[in-house]
């Protein structure tokens, strides 16, 4: 099943960052964990949102260019086995799929109800559709929240105002 591009809301990076921050805040407020880097995307997916992470080389995942997918009804995030031992790609893939959960789940389920298809979301090879671009943006904000990046920058280099000559 394909999305009708007219149904996909166009979200600004600021909107997407807010959704990622909302997930992080909700996770921190409803768990015994204090948030720190690296962001525990597996724990957020499994313990906070109730997803099962499945490492697979079956079916479409025989193609190593397809890194992950999400099955909303079964609460499964599938990750291509070829990236299991590549921490950065593995974490980004899970964060990307969480982006679909937070940004596209309701729309995808609505469209799938209209067509009676199982709601599995993954990207085919080729140009990235808007949903994939948005999920990538979400993943980057989830994995590197601005507040942590700014704090690390200031710790490493000092006052950002001096570096960028902002002069407030």
Model regions and ranges:
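Active-site hotspot residues in diverse enzymes, especially metal/ion-binding acidic/histidine motifs
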Residues: 1-168
């Amino acid at each position: 099943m394909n999305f009708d591009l007219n149904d996909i809301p166009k979200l600004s990076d600021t909107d997407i960052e807010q959704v990622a921050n909302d997930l992080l805040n909700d996770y921190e407020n409803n768990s015994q964990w204090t948030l720190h880097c690296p962001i525990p995307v597996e724990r957020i997916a499994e313990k906070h949102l109730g997803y099962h992470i499945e490492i697979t080389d079956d079916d479409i995942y025989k193609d190593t260019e397809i890194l992950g997918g999400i099955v909303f009804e079964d609460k499964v995030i599938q990750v291509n086995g070829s990236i299991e031992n590549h921490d950065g790609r593995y974490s980004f893939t899970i964060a990307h799929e969480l982006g679909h959960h937070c940004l596209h789940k309701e729309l995808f389920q609505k469209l799938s109800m209209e067509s009676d298809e199982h709601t599995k979301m993954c990207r085919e090879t080729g140009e990235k559709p808007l949903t994939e671009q948005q999920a990538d943006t979400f993943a980057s904000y989830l994995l590197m929240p601005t507040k942590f990046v700014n704090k690390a920058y200031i710790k490493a280099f000092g006052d950002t105002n001096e570096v960028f000559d902002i002069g407030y």
